[in-house]
């Protein structure tokens, strides 16, 4: 990874008050407890920080990856030569409006399933027990017992590789 670009990214993170760790062992951030160091782990607290970090990484040719709670993630002992955005507790809100659940990318599927149960909402039964975050589950179309995220996901707000916010509202939006 380009050293000057990483320095620019870290300077931007510092300036906006975004926590980060350099050369952090990924084994501390994966459910399998394996993995060498990531060049930089970034812990944004707001969507604005995510947007700014994505734009800065792109402008400085820094490879950027995104993770949730590190489930279903195998990292080599050699580590990751990239900056890694971590969608953690700062993006774990789950709310209910009517018969719709709104969950941020870092919210665990278990938390979303419990929220559905507490509000007598059905459709997520298949997801109970899947370790992972909502963002990762939506990205990979997680599923079990005949159900998949595509069956229950109505809309997804995302930030693309250019740092622009957008929404996907149906399968045709992805194709």
Go through each PLM region and give its residues.
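N-terminal, positively charged, Ser/Thr/Ala/Gly-biased leader segments
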Residues: 1-67
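Structural signature of FAD isoalloxazine-binding scaffolds in flavoprotein oxidoreductases
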Residues: 35, 42-47, 74-92, 139-169
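Structural motif
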Residues: 39-41, 62-65, 72-73, 81-85, ...
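A gly/ser-rich beta-alpha-beta helix-loop segment of oxidoreductase catalytic cores
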Residues: 110-119, 123-154, 160
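Conserved small/polar residues in nucleotide/adenosyl-binding loops
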Residues: 174-175
């Amino acid at each position: 990874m380009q050293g000057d670009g990483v320095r620019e990214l870290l300077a931007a993170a510092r300036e906006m008050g975004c926590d980060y760790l350099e050369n952090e062992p990924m084994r501390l951030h994966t459910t399998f407890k394996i993995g060498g160091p990531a060049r930089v782990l970034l812990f944004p607290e707001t969507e604005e920080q995510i947007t700014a970090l994505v734009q800065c990484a792109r402008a400085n040719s820094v490879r950027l990856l995104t993770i949730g709670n590190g489930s279903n993630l195998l990292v080599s002992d050699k580590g990751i030569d990239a900056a890694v955005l971590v969608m953690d507790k700062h993006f774990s809100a789950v709310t209910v409006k009517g018969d719709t659940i709104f969950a941020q990318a870092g919210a665990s599927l278990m938390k979303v399933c419990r929220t559905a149960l507490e509000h007598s909402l059905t459709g997520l039964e298949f997801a109970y027990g899947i370790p992972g975050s909502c963002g990762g589950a939506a990205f990979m179309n997680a599923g079990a017992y005949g159900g998949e995220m595509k069956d229950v996901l109505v809309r997804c707000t995302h930030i693309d590789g250019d740092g622009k916010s957008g929404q996907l509202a149906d399968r045709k939006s992805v194709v």
